[in-house]
Amino acid sequence: TIKVPEGFDYELYNRNDINRYVDAVLTIPKVICDHLGLGVKTGLPYIWHSKASNPFVNLK
């Protein structure tokens, strides 16, 4: 994970066709966090959880 500095944009998707619009929309929370003085990080999560059980079996 990397900390995205205040005032800098970060790219979540490749900039092509519809993905560039998705990336533009996802920039809005970053601008809000910058305004509120909150940090934003991007990348893989610190803790990776994988379920050992099958959720469909658990529903029975």
Curated annotation (Swiss-Prot):
Q: Which UniProt keywords apply?
A: Allergen, Cell junction, Cell wall, Cell wall biogenesis/degradation, Cellulose biosynthesis, Golgi apparatus, Isomerase, Secreted
According to its UniProt record, this protein's enzyme class is isomerase
What Pfam families does this protein's entry cite? RGP
GO terms classed as biological process: cell wall organization; cellulose biosynthetic process; UDP-L-arabinose metabolic process
Q: Which InterPro entries match?
A: RGP_fam
User: Which GO cellular component terms, listed alphabetically, does the Swiss-Prot or TrEMBL entry include?
Assistant: cytosol; extracellular region; Golgi apparatus; plasmodesma
Gene Ontology MF term list: UDP-arabinopyranose mutase activity
Question: Which reactions appear under catalytic activity for this entry?
Answer: UDP-beta-L-arabinofuranose = UDP-beta-L-arabinopyranose
Q: Tell me its cofactors.
A: Mn(2+); Mg(2+)
Q: What else is known?
A: On the 2D-gel the determined pI of this protein is: 6.24, its MW is: 20 kDa.
Q: What does this protein do?
A: Probable UDP-L-arabinose mutase involved in the biosynthesis of cell wall non-cellulosic polysaccharides.
Q: What's the subunit arrangement here?
A: Homopentamer or homohexamer.
Family classification: Belongs to the RGP family.
The name of this protein is Probable UDP-arabinopyranose mutase 1
According to the entry, what is the taxonomic lineage of the organism? Answer: Eukaryota, Viridiplantae, Streptophyta, Embryophyta, Tracheophyta
